[in-house]
Swiss-Prot record:
One of its GO terms (cellular component) is transport vesicle. The keyword Disulfide bond applies. Keywords: Amidation, Antibiotic, Antimicrobial, Calcium, Cleavage on pair of basic residues, Cytoplasmic vesicle, Disulfide bond, Fungicide, Glycoprotein, Oxidation, Phosphoprotein, Proteoglycan, Secreted, Signal. Its main location: cytoplasm. The gene is CHGA. The modification Glycine amide is found at residue 312. The modification Methionine sulfoxide is found at residue 364. Pfam families: Granin. Residues 1-18 form the signal peptide. The modification Phosphotyrosine is found at residue 191. It comes from the Eukaryota. This is Chromogranin-A. Highest concentration of GE-25 found in adrenal medulla with lower levels present in the pituitary, the intestinal mucosa and the pancreas. Also found in the brain. InterPro entries: Chromogranin_AB, Chromogranin_CS, Granin.
Amino acid sequence: MRSAAVLALLLCAGQVIALPVNSPMNKGDTEVMKCIVEVISDTLSKPSPMPVSKECFETLRGDERILSILRHQNLLKELQDLALQGAKERTHQQKKHSSYEDELSEVLEKPNDQAEPKEVTEEVSSKDAAEKRDDFKEVEKSDEDSDGDRPQASPGLGPGPKVEEDNQAPGEEEEAPSNAHPLASLPSPKYPGPQAKEDSEGPSQGPASREKGLSAEQGRQTEREEEEEKWEEAEAREKAVPEEESPPTAAFKPPPSLGNKETQRAAPGWPEDGAGKMGAEEAKPPEGKGEWAHSRQEEEEMARAPQVLFRGGKSGEPEQEEQLSKEWEDAKRWSKMDQLAKELTAEKRLEGEEEEEEDPDRSMRLSFRARGYGFRGPGLQLRRGWRPNSREDSVEAGLPLQVRGYPEEKKEEEGSANRRPEDQELESLSAIEAELEKVAHQLEELRRG
């Protein structure tokens, strides 16, 4: 009996141990499970929905595990959205980068394309400038050679001392018409001759007439050289003739000025009546006329050269024609500037002489200056040697040097030696002014061009 009772107790104790004990945590979980079952059944039974109780909603909203599950689900959605957005942004950035690279390549290509023609134009412009400078130097050299050779012919031409003795007879009234005659045959700087007109009309002609101006200038230079050789031969002959005729007393005398020369030329056949005047004028050696004819011949040759170029230059290429025409225009421009500078210096020197007309020794100073320094053109020498406004100076210039005597010549030479530094300073100042005017004209031409 006792054993049976013990077994029964053991069985009861085992059953009691095997039965679950309901704790508060288990109660909450069971309620949550029931609410989840209700929600699932509600979603599955859509045609005939089973409403979820309010208690289940409250338990589900209060349970942290369900909230974490829902948050986790939302995070997954957000991550997916972020992934899609990142992919879109990457594609957009790639497109932008590619477009930016294309723009950079285009921008880099454009300056290279623009730099190449700029370099080409700079090279062409530098070559053109060098050629223009060379042409201008050649033109200046030719002008200086022609201007330097012509004035040398005038001092060499002159009668001997016998003619000077005969010059004492004519009076003041007869000097004015005789000396005014050679001045009328000379070209004045204010009224340009046909050469200046052709230079002014040259740019208006067609480009074909200008295409080979440099070759024409070279031809002119050769012609000028030949003419200069002829002039030198004629000068040597003319110098030899008066040396043979003149006595040895002419060795110590200074060469007479141009005003003296003009009076000497007019003196030998001068009686006091009007017919004698005409004969004296006809008996003058035509030095001024010969120079004028020589300049006229040069102008005619220069006028013929563009016509020949216009006839024979039509077969050239258009680019060469344009280039040669530009060079021809530039050469003409530089030559005009040189002529203007020379004219300005000549006018300034003449103004300085007019201010110093009151000095009685001016004619002798001019003779010494003409001998010692040598001016550029024949026109300047004639103007400095002859001044029709001052009769006293012209009378003193016309008197022979033998009458004045040797001591007077010594005094005049000493005075001229004292005045030479002043004359040198004046000439240097005038040369500086001429250079400054040339530079100013060049700057104006460059600004206009």
